[in-house]
C-alpha cells in the first residue's frame, strides 16, 4: 500500500473521534476522551507488530527446520517472543482503560 493512502485511512478515525467526543451527553474526566482511541491503537499496532515479528521468525524458522530438526524448541521460543508483543499491547490497553490515573 502506498503511503499516500495513509491520510485517507486516518481521516475517518479522526473525524469520527471528534464527532463522538462532541456528542458526549455526560461529563467525562479530564483527558479521558483519548484513552479509548489510545487503547485501540495499543492493541491494533501491537497486533500488527506481532504479526510482522511472528511472520519473519516463522519463515526463518521453517528454513532452519529443513536443515536441522533439533532446533525446533529454539525456533518455537523465538516465535513465542514475537507473539509477546501482542500480549503487551493488550496489557497496556487494559491498564489505560481500567487503571486509576
From Swiss-Prot:
One of its GO terms (molecular function) is ATP binding. Pfam families: ATP-synt_C. The N-terminus is blocked. The keyword Transmembrane helix applies. InterPro entries: ATPase_proteolipid_c-like_dom (IPR002379), ATPase_proteolipid_csu (IPR000245), F/V-ATP_Csub_sf (IPR035921). Keywords: ATP-binding, Cell membrane, Hydrogen ion transport, Hydrolase, Ion transport, Lipid-binding, Membrane, Nucleotide-binding, Transmembrane, Transmembrane helix, Transport. It is a multi-pass membrane protein. SUPFAM superfamilies: F1F0 ATP synthase subunit C. It is found in: Cell membrane. Signal peptide: none annotated. Its main location: membrane. It comes from the Archaea. The chain crosses the membrane at residues 5-25, 37-57, 75-95. One of its GO terms (cellular component) is proton-transporting V-type ATPase, V0 domain. Component of the A-type ATP synthase that produces ATP from ADP in the presence of a proton gradient across the membrane. Belongs to the V-ATPase proteolipid subunit family. Has multiple subunits with at least A(3), B(3), C, D, E, F, H, I and proteolipid K(x). This is A-type ATP synthase subunit K. It comes from Sulfurisphaera tokodaii (strain DSM 16993 / JCM 10545 / NBRC 100140 / 7).
